């Protein structure tokens, strides 16, 4: 579970900060949950938790569930939020986010 990688309190705080529809901001979220300050190895482990089908990529369907990937209490992202997150993370334009793209996305300020 994600709580093996990040503090439960930080996850809870980060997810509740974006409880309102259309409020998701990935930069603030990764900062609040503590992931941004973690090592590349931890970021890669988080990626593999979020990559539910273990395809090596986080596809749009999985991105929509990113908050639920951190905690079951998380909400699904709206289509607009998901599209914006995909656009921010998909550097090579293949329509999905690979592990290196994810690490870059989390690390960007």
From Swiss-Prot:
- One Pfam family name is EF-hand_7
SMART domains per record: EFh (SM00054)
Is Ribosomal protein included in the keywords of this UniProt record? no
Q: Where is the EF-hand domain?
A: 38-73, 77-109
GO annotations of cellular component type = cytoplasm
Mind listing the UniProt keywords for this protein, alphabetically? Calcium, Metal-binding, Muscle protein, Repeat
Q: Which CDD domains does this one have?
A: EFh_parvalbumin_alpha
The record, for InterPro entries, names: EF-hand-dom_pair, EF_Hand_1_Ca_BS, EF_hand_dom, Parvalbumin
Q: Name one GO molecular function term.
A: calcium ion binding
Positions binding Ca(2+) 1 in this chain are: 51, 53, 55, 57, 59, 62
Function, as annotated: In muscle, parvalbumin is thought to be involved in relaxation after contraction. It binds two calcium ions.
Additional information: This parvalbumin has an isoelectric point of 4.88.
The family line of this record is:
Belongs to the parvalbumin family.
Q: What is this protein called?
A: Parvalbumin alpha
Source organism: Pelophylax lessonae
């Amino acid at each position: 579970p994600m709580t093996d990688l990040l503090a439960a309190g930080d996850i809870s705080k980060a997810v509740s900060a974006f409880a309102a529809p259309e409020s998701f901001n990935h930069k603030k979220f990764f900062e609040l949950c503590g992931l941004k300050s973690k090592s590349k190895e931890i970021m890669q482990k988080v990626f593999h938790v979020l990559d539910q089908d273990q395809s090596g990529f986080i596809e749009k369907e999985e991105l929509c569930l990113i908050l639920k990937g951190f905690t079951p209490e998380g909400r699904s992202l709206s289509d607009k939020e998901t599209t914006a997150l995909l656009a921010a993370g998909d550097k090579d334009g293949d329509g999905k986010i690979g592990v290196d793209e994810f690490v870059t996305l989390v690390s960007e300020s």
